[in-house]
Structure formats: C-alpha cells, structure tokens
Curated annotation (Swiss-Prot):
Belongs to the chaperonin (HSP60) family. One of its GO terms (biological process) is protein refolding. Forms a cylinder of 14 subunits composed of two heptameric rings stacked back-to-back. Interacts with the co-chaperonin GroES. Keywords: ATP-binding, Chaperone, Cytoplasm, Isomerase, Nucleotide-binding. Together with its co-chaperonin GroES, plays an essential role in assisting protein folding. The GroEL-GroES system forms a nano-cage that allows encapsulation of the non-native substrate proteins and provides a physical environment optimized to promote and accelerate protein folding. This is Chaperonin GroEL 3. It catalyses: ATP + H2O + a folded polypeptide = ADP + phosphate + an unfolded polypeptide.
C-alpha cells in the first residue's frame, strides 16, 4: 500500500475550494443566451466545441489530487442533475460553488459545519416547495417550443422541431437525435419501439462517452427461452459474422457461459453483438416478442412453434436500421416489418382491448398498442462540419430533455428569475440556533448566483441587475440577456422546466453541504520521478 498524504481542517477545505472554483470557472462561462463556448482538446480528431456544462465538467481532471477531489465532487453535481433532469447542469454547478464558497468562509470563522448543513437542508427544501407551488403546467405546443428554444440557447427552430416531434409521437413518445448525412436538420417519424430493458453487460457498450450501445443495420434474434449455452446458436452466429452486420439478441435471459462467450467475441472484435432481456413476463413476454417480430419482419424462435435454435437461418432474424441500448432502455428504430403486418397486429390488439374485462389487462394492452403504433421520431442533425454537428446535437439533446421535464412538472420563469423570486420563502426563516440560521442565509445568497452569472456573461454587472429586479413586485419580471431589456419572462417565452430548477438546487445543496462538513482529506503521495539512467562507464567518447 502506497504512503498517503493527509490534510486537515482549513487547509483541506482550501484545497477543495480551489478545485471547485477551477471547475466552476470553466463551466459558468457557458450559462445563459450570451454564454461562451468551451474548446476541448481530443486525443484524436478535431477539438470539440461545446456550450454544454456537463460535457465541460466531465473533461476536467486536475493535477493536484486534493484540488481534484473538490472538482470531482462538483462534477458529480453536474452529472447527477443531467441524469435526473437532462439539463440545468451549469446552474447546478454555479449554485454548488456559491453555497460551498460561503459555507467554507463561515466554518473558517468558527461556525459549526453540521449546524450550517442543517440550515442549508432547511433552506433548500423550503425553496423546492416554493418552486413546485409556482410551477405552471405546459398546455400548448407553443409553450413546448419555447422551453426547447431556451434550452437550445435561444434557437427557435430547435424548439419548433421538438414541439412537432412531440405532436407526432405524443409527449411520452420516443424521440431520438442522430447525426445527418446532409447539411440540413430534419424531423422524420419512422416505425419503431422502445421497451424497458437495457444491456446485460456494460462490455457491449460501443459509445463509451454516452454509455450506450449503438448498432447500425443489425440482425435481431428473438428467442423465447433462457440461453445458458451458445452451442445451439453457433451456426447462426457464424452466418451473421459472414455478413459483417451486428447482432442483437433478445431472449428471456442470457446467462453464464453464453453471456461470457458473447462478451469475449465482442471485445475481440469478431462479432458486433449485444444482448438484452425480453420485455414483460409470462404470456405478455411472448406477445411483446411477437410485436417486435412484426416490427422487424423477424420470427420469434419458440419450441412451441417447432423452431429449434440450431435450425435458425438468417431469413428468420429481424432487421432494423438502428438500435440504441442504454442502461435501462432499448430503442428499435425503423424496423423493416411490412406495414400490413404491423397494422394487422394493431387491429388484433384493439379487438382484445374491446373484449377484455380486466382493467389490468386493458392497461397493459394499451401500453403495447402505444409502443407499436406510436413510432419513433428521429431528429437528424445536419451541419457544415463534423464539429458543428456535434455541438448542435448536444444542444438539441439538452433541449429535448428540458422539454420532457417541462411536460412532467410544469414551467417557471427562466433566466434565474424563479430562484431569485423564491427567496421570499426564506424571508424571516430562523433556525434553532445562530449557525443553522447562517446556513439558511447561505442558500438565500446562493439563489442570486445564476442570474448574476447570466448578466455577467452578457457584459453587465450582476449585482445591479439583481438590485433592480429585487425592487420590482411582479414575480415574472426578469432580465432578458438576449435583448438586454427587463421583460415579463413568461410572456417573452423565457421559461425553465420546474424539474430542472428544482433538481439543480437539490443536487447543488446536497454536495456543497457534504463539502462544508469535510474535515480531513487523504490522497496518495505522488511518486517521485526516478533519476534518468546513467550511460555505461568508459563509453563516453566513441569517436562520433
């Protein structure tokens, strides 16, 4: 075990704070409509240009191990907010840095960190309740477009495209974003389906950055039973390898030797393969496999139908243009199934819904019907260069996540106004002692941080903007950094999803409170570089 370096108390928190500030300074410049871009060097290919906070945060790794701990903790805030709400990562980072900065000062002044933490928790939960109470449900397609446009940094065409996509496949429908082969960005609705099962092993992942499996033009094998051994599968696996196409295996389960063999083949590059469990249970599983078979023009391999695995041919496998598999979901896009077969399946389900008397069965049939009939909306992102396409794709994915969050929990005034106005929930709030009250005040001050940063990125003094807005009684009044005017944010279409604002504050408060209560830091002592090797004696002058 290597020797460790230990830092205590104020020294430990000072190192943490330096790391937090370095990460915050890199991320905060992207906030708001006039936020700047960040250029990230890549090991191969052109540098990446992005305005996405979580992408910037994920790239940061500091040389000093103690400072790096602080940076990684706040990076966790950005990642967690992104996972839960899909947007608001920069806001979460700015809030976390503000709460920790103020908290570290008060701990250094002799206040009790545990009491401060209690105050922060009280303040955050009061603000969350206030945000939820003020949230307004999203009703129209126009409001959905507004949310999308704001999340895409003021790009109205992106907002409109997302609103159209939601109109076509429904608010709960499947919408995917992929790179186009042309310069235009377009929306297309294709036959497809999503179900709640993810990859059986992370070794199947093909896109490590997004931790997902992306299969282009794959064969799809649908098997009703568990797979424990691959012996029976070998003939069809060899046939798929000959085609050079990937293979998706959907079965009740893939266990032990079979899973290990597939993983080894994938890692060695012999066979592009991924395996997922079939959705549903019992008879419902069989029905869903038949739905997928209709969608992909494949055949379900079932011994009830007299088909054995060893006799399967390529013609029995389904096909699709693209399959995306994440940790918990699988999306099949543009299956090659015939429209007539899919329609027949849909009609059969509608008839079953009419006939069934069980509410539970009816609900499950309606779920299956929605999955099969809804299709998948695909937004194909175009651009002049690969760098532009990647940057635009980041923004559209952010906007899509924000719109889903808005539909889920409603909207609040954007541009940092919702947090600033929610300060009223903490006015006069007192803790059980002075230190708890100081913790509440930390949150009170932090609520101004996002709007200050948006103003500063637009070239204004943040405190002047905050001062002017605080003096106005209208809760929707805010500063539009794009036009540099004071407007009614909701009327101007500058809105944020309540879920994004709430999640950003909760995650920031949680991590910052943990950092404030840190008293000791432990890290490996960096290894000293060994002295350079000395040349053999007596060989100094060899006549060169």
């Amino acid at each position: 075990m290597s020797a460790k370096e230990i830092k205590f108390s104020t020294d430990a928190r000072a190192h943490l704070l330096r790391g937090v500030e370095l990460l915050n300074n890199a991320v905060k410049v992207t906030l708001g409509p006039k936020g700047r871009n960040v250029v990230i060097d890549k090991a191969y290919g052109a540098p990446r240009i992005t305005k996405d906070g979580v992408t910037v945060a994920r790239e940061i790794e500091l040389g000093n191990k103690f400072e790096n701990m602080g940076a990684q903790m706040v990076r966790e805030v950005a990642s967690k907010t992104n996972d839960l709400a899909g947007d608001g990562t920069t806001t979460a980072t700015v809030l976390a840095a503000s709460i920790f900065r103020e908290g570290a000062k008060l701990v250094a002044a002799g206040m009790n960190p545990m009491d401060l933490r209690r105050g922060i928790d009280l303040g955050v939960s009061a603000i969350v309740k206030e945000i939820q109470a003020r949230a307004r449900k999203v009703k129209s397609s126009g409001e959905i477009a507004q949310v999308g446009a704001i999340a895409a940094n003021g790009d109205a065409t992106v907002g409109e495209m997302i609103a159209k996509a939601m109109e076509k496949v429904g608010n709960e429908g499947v919408i995917t974003v992929e790179e186009a082969r042309t310069a235009e960005t377009e929306l297309d609705v294709v036959e497809g389906m999503q179900f709640d099962r993810g990859y059986l092993s992370p070794y199947f992942v093909t896109n490590a950055e997004k931790m997902r499996v992306e299969l282009e033009d794959p064969y799809i094998l649908l098997h009703e039973k568990k797979l424990g051994s691959l012996q029976a599968l070998l003939p069809i696996l060899e046939a798929v390898v000959q085609t050079g196409k990937p293979l998706l295996l959907i079965s009740e389960d893939v266990e032990g030797e079979a899973l290990a063999t597939l993983v080894v083949n994938k890692l060695r590059g012999g066979l592009k393969v991924a395996a997922v469990k079939a959705p549903g249970f019992g008879d419902r599983r069989k029905a869903m496999l038949e739905d997928i078979a209709a969608l992909t023009s494949g055949q379900m391999i079932s011994e009830d139908l007299g088909i054995k695995l060893e006799n399967v041919t390529l013609y029995m496998l389904g096909r699709a243009k693209r399959v995306l598999i994440e940790k918990d979901t699988t999306t099949i896009i543009d299956g090659t199934g015939e429209k007539a077969a899919i329609q027949a399946r849909i009609q059969q389900m509608k008839a079953q819904i009419e006939e069934t008397t069980s509410d539970y069965d009816k609900e499950k049939l309606q779920e299956r019907l929605a999955k099969l009939a809804g299709g998948v909306a695909v937004i194909r992102v175009g651009g002049a260069t690969e760098t532009e396409v990647k940057e635009k794709k980041d923004r559209i994915e952010d906007a899509l996540n924000a719109t889903r969050a808005a539909v889920e929990e409603g909207i609040v005034p954007g541009g940092g106004v919702a947090l600033l106005r929610a300060k009223s929930a903490l006015t006069g709030m007192v803790g059980e002692n002075a230190d708890v009250t100081a913790g509440i005040s930390i949150v009170l001050r932090a609520l101004e941080a996002p709007i200050r940063q948006i103003a500063e990125n637009a070239g204004f003094e943040g405190s002047i903007i905050v001062g002017r807005l605080t003096g106005r009684n209208d809760h929707n009044q805010g500063f539009d950094a794009q036009t540099e005017t004071y407007v009614d944010m909701v009327e101007a279409g500058i809105v944020d999803p309540a879920k994004v604002v709430r999640t950003a504050l909760q995650d920031a408060g949680s991590i910052a409170a943990l950092l404030i209560t840190a008293e000791v830091m432990i890290a490996d002592i960096p290894a000293r570089n060994p002295a350079p090797a000395v040349g053999n004696g007596g060989m100094g002058d060899m006549g060169y």
